[in-house]
């Protein structure tokens, strides 16, 4: 098995799914997983994209050292050129000097494929001359596909396609085939967008006298509008999800469900079960919807299932400011690990991604809360000042400070003002945390402490008439 990404941008979630499918299939078959970086597009390749591929694979559990590679397609240039020469010398390819504009003028249509004009001109290599494969004039090419059966392609409808540029460098079709042959690849799992290339590549395998691999074209991943996921339009970079605080286990679980389902009525499935149950033959050939809302829900489930120590450890990059997004509004020396540990079980049940921990606990580590003015306007209605006066007095007089005491006290004060507990909580919550929603209020007050709570209530009271 091989996974062959191109280092031309951020690592795509669709690529991550293909990598996982190849990884599992290789383990199931007792085979070898090969990482081959297809780096022949010199104008677009960047070393940081290659490093990003390696880091992304490591994040989803495909660690360096557990596979062969990375190999680089550019290092096989000699083999590519040798294969092109072999095809030319064997009469299976010919040189052509037709430009796209000339072909269009000759055929009268920009959509018509190459017309075979140079097939019998016996041109040799030279400037402006590409090498084209001589497609058979009859018959059909049958692709054996574990997911799609045996798609059949009429050879007469396959144009004589370019396999090498005028400078001798191979195009993707030839380089890909030669690399797979060189590496002894027996199965190719890739996205269905490559299916139109497959009969051409299979013809190349046949022409080079080597048995082609077994193919498996997995369904394309689409957005909610059923459009193929686009780097320009959609959130597709695996790194972006990692940096936002998605868990690798949740991401892997979700990606494997794009086109496949485990046994039973379940979706949250342990990875060992996925590795055991996954079957390429069971993959649905229809397009797979990448539902970010569902992924968030998955991630929330995985977060809630973490042991509390792992949850606390997982939040550390955002709490300490070492994460790449969502920097905390407090200074490193203001962070109180003990206070966070006290509220961590409460926060764990309320966030869907780890980066959401910051706005849920920032009130604990700041001298004054960050007031959401919209929340303030909704909570501080007429009578809020009188309510806060009474709450301040009652909280000051409490003999002990804990969640039960503050709750019963606020409930009593609210009743005196004709308010149920939910209504009475709103101005207190905004005054203390800056927000209308968040962690359970009374447990938060206990951790915050009496003096800091009263200081914030008094500051809020000063803003009111």
Swiss-Prot record:
Coiled-coil residue windows: none
An individual GO BP term: glutamyl-tRNA aminoacylation
Any GO CC annotation of this UniProt entry: cytosol
Amino acids binding ATP: 231
Ranges spanned by the short sequence motif 'KMSKS' region, renumbered to the chain: 228-232
Cellular localisation: Cytoplasm
Comment on bound cofactor: Binds 1 zinc ion per subunit.
Subunit structure: Monomer.
Reaction catalyzed: tRNA(Glu) + L-glutamate + ATP = L-glutamyl-tRNA(Glu) + AMP + diphosphate
Any one GO MF annotation of this record: zinc ion binding
Predominant subcellular localization, coarse grouping: cytoplasm
Short name of one Pfam family: tRNA-synt_1c
Enzyme Commission number(s) from the entry: 6.1.1.17
UniProt keyword annotations, A-Z: Aminoacyl-tRNA synthetase, ATP-binding, Cytoplasm, Ligase, Metal-binding, Nucleotide-binding, Protein biosynthesis, Zinc
Family, as annotated: Belongs to the class-I aminoacyl-tRNA synthetase family. Glutamate--tRNA ligase type 1 subfamily.
The keyword tRNA processing appears for this protein: no
Motif ('HIGH' region): 5-15
UniProt protein name: Glutamate--tRNA ligase
Cofactors, names only: Zn(2+)
UniProt: Zn(2+) binding residues: 96, 98, 118, 120
Job description of the protein: Catalyzes the attachment of glutamate to tRNA(Glu) in a two-step reaction: glutamate is first activated by ATP to form Glu-AMP and then transferred to the acceptor end of tRNA(Glu).
Native organism taxonomy: Bacteria, Bacillati, Actinomycetota, Actinomycetes, Micromonosporales
């Amino acid at each position: 098995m091989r996974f062959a990404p191109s280092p031309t941008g951020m690592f795509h979630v669709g690529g991550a799914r293909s990598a996982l499918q190849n990884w599992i299939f290789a383990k199931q078959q007792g085979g070898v997983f090969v990482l081959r970086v297809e780096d022949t597009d010199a104008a677009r390749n960047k070393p940081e994209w290659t490093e990003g591929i390696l880091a992304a694979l490591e994040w989803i559990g495909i660690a360096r050292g557990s596979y062969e590679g990375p190999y680089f397609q550019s290092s096989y240039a000699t083999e590519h050129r040798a294969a092109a020469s072999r095809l030319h010398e064997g009469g299976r390819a010919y040189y052509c000097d037709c430009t796209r504009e000339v072909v269009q003028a000759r055929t009268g249509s920009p959509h018509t494929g190459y017309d075979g004009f140079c097939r019998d001109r016996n041109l040799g290599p030279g400037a402006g001359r590409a090498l084209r494969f001589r497609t058979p004039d009859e018959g059909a090419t049958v692709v054996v596909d574990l997911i799609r059966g045996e798609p059949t392609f009429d050879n007469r409808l396959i144009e004589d396609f370019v396999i090498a540029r005028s400078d001798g460098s191979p195009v993707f079709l030839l380089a890909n085939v030669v690399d797979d042959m060189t590496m002894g690849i027996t199965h190719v799992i890739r996205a269905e967008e490559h299916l139109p290339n497959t009969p051409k590549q299979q013809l190349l395998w046949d022409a080079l006298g080597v048995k082609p691999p077994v193919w498996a074209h997995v369904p394309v991943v689409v957005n909610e509008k059923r459009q193929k996921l686009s780097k320009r339009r959609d959130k597709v970079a695996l790194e972006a999800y990692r940096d936002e605080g998605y868990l690798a286990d949740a991401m892997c679980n979700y990606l494997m469900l794009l086109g496949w389902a485990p046994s039973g009525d379940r979706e949250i499935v342990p990875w060992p079960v996925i590795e055991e149950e996954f079957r390429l033959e069971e993959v649905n050939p229809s397009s797979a919807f990448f539902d970010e809302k569902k992924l968030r829900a998955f991630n929330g489930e995985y977060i809630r299932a973490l042991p509390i120590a792992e949850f606390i450890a997982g939040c550390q990059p955002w709490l300490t400011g070492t994460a790449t997004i969502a920097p905390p509004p407090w200074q490193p020396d203001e962070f109180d690990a003990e206070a966070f540990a006290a509220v961590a079980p409460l926060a764990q049940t309320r966030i869907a991604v780890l980066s959401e921990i910051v706005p849920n606990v920032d009130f604990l580590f700041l001298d004054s809360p960050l007031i959401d003015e919209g929340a303030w306007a909704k909570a501080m209605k007429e009578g809020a000042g009188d309510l806060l006066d009474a709450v301040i007095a009652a909280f000051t007089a409490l003999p002990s400070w804990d969640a039960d005491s503050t709750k019963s006290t606020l409930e009593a004060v609210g009743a005196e003002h004709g308010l149920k507990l939910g209504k009475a909580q709103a101005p207190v919550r905004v005054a203390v945390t800056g927000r209308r929603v968040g962690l359970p209020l009374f447990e938060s007050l206990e951790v915050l402490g009496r003096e800091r709570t009263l200081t914030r209530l008094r500051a809020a009271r000063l803003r009111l008439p």
